[in-house]
Structure formats: C-alpha cells, structure tokens
Amino acid sequence: MSPRIAWALILHGDNPADAGWLRPDEAYRLRKRIETLSDDPDPAVRLQAWLANRADTHHLHAQDVPAVLKDERLVPSGISDPRSQMSAARRGEGYTRTDALEDLTLDHLLVPATPARSNFTLHVTAIMPMRPVPEVLLAADLADRGGPRETIRSGEVFQEWLTHQVGLR
C-alpha cells in the first residue's frame, strides 16, 4: 500500500472517502479491503503488511529519551504510547514530520545506530498523526518491533481497532 493510501486508512479507518486526497475509486477499494479484515484469521499480519510504507524509519541513539518524547515536534507511539502497556523507560518511539527531522536530530543529539544498538525508533512522514496516535498506527508500530510481548499486544490493539470500524463488528 502506498503511503498516501496507508495514511487514509490510519486517519480515516472505515471512512476512507473522508481523506480528501483519495479518488472515489481508491476510497472504495480501500473500504473493501478493510471489510475483508473481519473474516481474516490474523488481521494483524495483513494490516502490518498494508502499513509497511507508512513512514521512513530511523534507528537512533538518544542521550535523553524522555526529553525527546516531550518534544512537541514528536508524537509518541509504539512502546512509548501508554496504551501499549509496555515498560520501556530507556527506549522511545514516535513520529515526526519530514521537515522537522533535521532540527529534532540536532536539538537532541540523535545519532544513527543499528537496530540492535538503537534506543529510539523515529518514524518520519509528511503527515503528522494526531496525539495520541490512532490505534491502528499503534498496533502497526508494536507489530514492527517483532518481540513476543509486542506482537501479542499488537494483535489485541488491532482487534480493538477493528471493533470500532463501522460494519466490522
């Protein structure tokens, strides 16, 4: 799924026509795809695949994770969202806009790191999600981490999101 379509799903869920940037045929196809999730035995895996292109992901090392998470140019997500029910005091995750990346990186002395050595996952996108991030975005971020606790919680959050979609209850 392209980033444009993925963000229509993230921000508008079962009403993709509300995304002013989709053509009517794209909104219709996205709505039909969402409807297939109610019959899917593992909708979390499918949604994770659909949302794979939602942002550019940077693995970084932060000197002061709490300070980065408090920065207004960042929206916490994944393990940093309280709804994740994860305890990640020394790690952080969040979204920032493409045009804020350079300043955020400089202000917090964020340096690139391998995924194994990073303590901050920064998702960079042209579309800034609201605070708190939509459930479907939280679930996708948790699924991307791949750990057993994150995977289980991701599935639970995806199910919660599905129950909120009109016509999929």
Which stretches of residues belong to each language-model region?
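Phosphate-handling catalytic interfaces
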Residues: 4-7, 11-169
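Basic, Lys/Arg-rich alpha-helical nucleic-acid-recognition elements, primarily the DNA-binding modules
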Residues: 1
